[in-house]
Structure formats: C-alpha cells, structure tokens
C-alpha cells in the first residue's frame, strides 16, 4: 500500500466514534484497491466532512451534496461492507 493510501486508511479508521470508524474505515477496506487518482482525491475530500454528515448521507437521512454524488457514494450507501457480529 502506498503512502497516500496508508494516510487515507488511517484517516478513515480514526474518525472519533466506533460507528464512524466501522462505516468509513470498512468502506475504505472494501473499495480502495479499485480506486484510481480521481477516486482517491474524492475520498480524501469526503474525509474532510464531519462524521455526522457522512453517516447521514450514507443512511439517507440527509441529501448528498452534488460534489459527492456518483459511484463512490452509491457504494457507500449500500452499507454491505460493514461486518456485523452474529
């Protein structure tokens, strides 16, 4: 993993709440391998937003800003990457 991805991973997994870590960090782990430069930049921008906003966009309780609409947000909204204890 290159330096940029390591930094994104750290930022994704150290958000401030366990719930945000699981959602945003889990999303990173599930999807980062397929990202090019554009997706990396978009994810880096997304990480500058508050956890409350990101989580609200992901679960659909707030509208997603136009700048984040697209395949990455569609994948985040699926929430199929979060490990749930059984």
Regions found by a protein language model. Give the residues of each.
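Positively charged, polar, low-complexity stretches
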Residues: 2-86
């Amino acid at each position: 993993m290159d330096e940029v991805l390591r930094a994104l991973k750290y930022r994704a997994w150290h958000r401030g709440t366990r719930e945000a870590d699981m959602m945003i960090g889990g999303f990173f782990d599930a999807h980062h391998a397929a990202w090019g430069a554009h997706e990396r930049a978009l994810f880096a921008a997304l990480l500058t937003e508050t956890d409350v906003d990101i989580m609200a966009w992901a679960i659909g309780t707030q509208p997603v800003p136009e700048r984040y609409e697209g395949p990455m947000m569609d994948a985040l909204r699926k929430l199929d990457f979060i490990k749930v204890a059984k």
